[in-house]
Structure formats: structure tokens, C-alpha cells
Amino acid sequence: MAAAYSTVGAVNRAPLSLNGSGARASLVPSTAFFGSSLKKSAAKFPKASSGNFKIVAQEISEDQQTDKDKWKGLAYDISDDQQDITRGKGMVDTLFQAPMQSGTHYAVMSSYDYISQGLRQYNLDNNMDGFYIAPAFMDKLVVHITKNFLSLPNIKIPLILGIWGGKGQGKSFQCELVFAKMGINPIMMSAGELESGNAGEPAKLIRQRYREAADIIKKGKMCCLFINDLDAGAGRMGGTTQYTVNNQMVNATLMNIADNPTNVQLPGMYNKEENPRVPIIVTGNDFSTLYAPLIRDGRMEKFYWAPTREDRIGVCKGIFRTDNVPEEDIVKVVDQFPGQSIDFFGALRARVYDDEVRKWVSEVGVDTIGKKLVNSKEGPPTFEQPKMTIDKLLQYGNMLVEEQENVKRVQLADKYMSEAALGDANQDAIKRGTF
């Protein structure tokens, strides 16, 4: 048996020849298992240098890599984590699954879905395009946003800036110009999103949009939450409007976020990770309709926007910047209608194009307008820019003012309730002789 073991041992431990070098016999351990008759042979060649033997992996050539290559996944990660997580739904403890399709198990199938639906991106430069930003407006907005990104010692900074004022004074557009100037793409919300058929949905949406803005800040880009016409969605407009649970929860949610701006959680999902602070900008016409504790000074900083004569002239220069209207004519138009909002002058400019549209309609015929506008091979018509003279601007401006006065003066709703007549509308036509 000893001979048998020796034979086996001698065969298994024969010197291995690798690249011309033999294994040295001294490396073979001496053990009783192999027997005493084991031959120990010396190396015939000197030991090779370990630095001469290298294993090198060739880099992947993207030109040779094709989409049909079944081994493509070895070099590139082509898995979809979202779908992998979704497949595991039902096998994960429900403690880690959030309700209402807001947890990690809900697959985001398109990369476009990662871009927030409320993200507003601007393609304008207020310097190049000639838009006017009121200095007082810009100062208030820039200081508020900057303060919220600073850590000032022992100072409680209001998270919300409420910009309010008359209708059509350019509050939202001035905000957008300042955002574009600062390089901010805000997360947008409007008053229509502050009510829903489902109780609690608007409050959840505010938290969701706030966290989306916080994620953008976390990635190193400034952002803010911008809510248009907050009073129209969350305020009480007299006894005729109903105060719903959603109105109450929107006010309460904004109060809670203002008190805890770095700990905003979605309903049903709670973790201890803090989120960046996101400044909130809201606009409205009358903040007295909002819940009073929301607009107190510690939570909301208020700014009443009433454009001065210089502001109105500056904005109107931007409105008529492509029409070659002389500056002195713009000043005359602004001074002629001192009580009108800034939006009035935009409507005035649009009204001047009525003559061009009327001329085009008479050329093509009323019965073929649909074919020319919607189903035309030539594309939509193009108009030459009409010449805007001071007389034409004043004429159309007076027409707009007259229509405003009719709405305020006639008030047909009261007439309909009291008698079957058209009120003073017919009286005007009788006086003009056109009845």
C-alpha cells in the first residue's frame, strides 16, 4: 500500500512546466502521506521574474458593441430599477409601501416623468428682450429668496412671500422675469390645483411640489415654489363661496411648512432625513380672505405691489418694443389712462390687430375660414405689422374704457331679476340712434 501511495503521490505532485520554468521541489511539503520514497527533483531552469507575466483586459470598443449583442448587459447596466422594485411589490412588508402610488414600488416608466409637471423653464432674457423689471419689485423678491438660502444667526426668516395688489398689474409676469434673471426654474402651482374632489389631495400636492423643489436644490440648483392666485383657491370670497375641507387643509399645510420648512413629509411616508429649505412665493389680489394665522408676520412677508408712473411707462415700453412706437407717444397713452391696469395696455395692442384680421377675413370669405386656419397646406396666415399711431391707440383705448363702463353701469343681472328688459343697454342705443 505504501508503494501505491507513493505512485499516486509522485504522479500528482509532478513538476509543472509553466513558460519554461519548472516548479521547485523544495516547495513540495514533506508529509508521511506521500511515503519516504518520494523523489525530490530540482528546477532545471531559473525562476522567471514575476514582473514579466501580466494579464491585461482589453477595453470595450463602443463601435463593436451593437444593440443585438446579448452580452451587452455585462458592460452596461441596462436594468430598470423601477420595474425591479415593482416586481417585488407584495413580497415587501407593507410598512415600507406608501399609499396612493407615491412609494418606491410605483414605477416611473419614462424619464420625462422625473421632470416635475410643475417645473417652469424660461427661454427669455429680460436684458436682451427688453422687458422691464420694477426696481422695488426685484429688490423685494431677490432679498427674500436670498435670505432663505442663508443661515443668519438667531433670526427667524419668513418662508412665504405674499405679493398682492390690484388685478392685471403684472405680479406674476414680474415674478417670472426675476426668476429668469436669477436663473431659477420654479415649481409652479395655480389656484385651480388647490381644490379637488378627493379630500386631502391639494394638501398632498403642495407637499409633493415642495419636495420636488427641495430635490432640485439638493442637486445644486436654486429653486422655489411659486403659487399663483392663492386667495382665489384658498380664500373665502364672501358668503356665497363654500369653505371646504381642502381649503382648510391647504391653509394648515402652508402653516405647517412655514413652521417646519426642512421637515416636509408626504402623507403616510415619514423618515428623519431633512430636506433643503425652499422659499415659497405666492400672489393674490386680497390676502384678507385667507386664514389669518397663515399671513402673520412670522410665516408670511407681505408686499403690496402698486406700480408707479415710471413702472407703468417702463412696462409699456416692453409691450410696444417691436412696434416702433415713439417713447413720447407711450408716455401720452399711459397718462391718458391713469386708472387702468398694466394688462389694459396689452389688450390695447392686441385690439390694433383687429383691422388686419378683419381685412383678411373679407379676402378669404367667412365660409372658408376653417379650411384656411385649421386644414390648410399653406399654413396659418401671416400679417404685416400694422402701424400704431397715437391717434389709433387713443381711439381703441377709449373703446376699451367704454366697454368697461358698460359692464359696471348696466348690471343686467339685477334687471333680469326685476323685469323682462335689457336695462340701460337699449337706452344707449336709442340715444345714439342705432336702436
UniProtKB/Swiss-Prot annotation:
<keyword id="KW-0150">Chloroplast</keyword>
<feature type="transit peptide" description="Chloroplast">
    <location>
        <begin position="1"/>
        <end position="56"/>
    </location>
</feature>
<dbReference type="Pfam" id="PF21228">
    <property type="entry name" value="RuBisCO_activase_AAA_helical"/>
</dbReference>
<comment type="similarity">
    <text>Belongs to the RuBisCO activase family.</text>
</comment>
<keyword id="KW-0809">Transit peptide</keyword>
<keyword id="KW-0934">Plastid</keyword>
<dbReference type="InterPro" id="IPR027417">
    <property type="entry name" value="P-loop_NTPase"/>
</dbReference>
<dbReference type="InterPro" id="IPR003959">
    <property type="entry name" value="ATPase_AAA_core"/>
</dbReference>
<dbReference type="InterPro" id="IPR044960">
    <property type="entry name" value="RCA-like"/>
</dbReference>
<dbReference type="GO" id="GO:0046863">
    <property type="term" value="F:ribulose-1,5-bisphosphate carboxylase/oxygenase activator activity"/>
</dbReference>
<comment type="function">
    <text>Activation of RuBisCO (ribulose-1,5-bisphosphate carboxylase/oxygenase; EC 4.1.1.39) involves the ATP-dependent carboxylation of the epsilon-amino group of lysine leading to a carbamate structure.</text>
</comment>
<dbReference type="GO" id="GO:0005524">
    <property type="term" value="F:ATP binding"/>
</dbReference>
<protein>
    <recommendedName>
        <fullName>Ribulose bisphosphate carboxylase/oxygenase activase 2, chloroplastic</fullName>
    </recommendedName>
</protein>
<dbReference type="GO" id="GO:0009579">
    <property type="term" value="C:thylakoid"/>
</dbReference>
<feature type="binding site">
    <location>
        <begin position="165"/>
        <end position="172"/>
    </location>
    <ligand>
        <name>ATP</name>
    </ligand>
</feature>
<dbReference type="InterPro" id="IPR048571">
    <property type="entry name" value="RuBisCO_activase_AAA_helical"/>
</dbReference>
<dbReference type="GO" id="GO:0016887">
    <property type="term" value="F:ATP hydrolysis activity"/>
</dbReference>
<dbReference type="Pfam" id="PF00004">
    <property type="entry name" value="AAA"/>
</dbReference>
<keyword id="KW-0067">ATP-binding</keyword>
<keyword id="KW-0547">Nucleotide-binding</keyword>
<dbReference type="GO" id="GO:0009570">
    <property type="term" value="C:chloroplast stroma"/>
</dbReference>
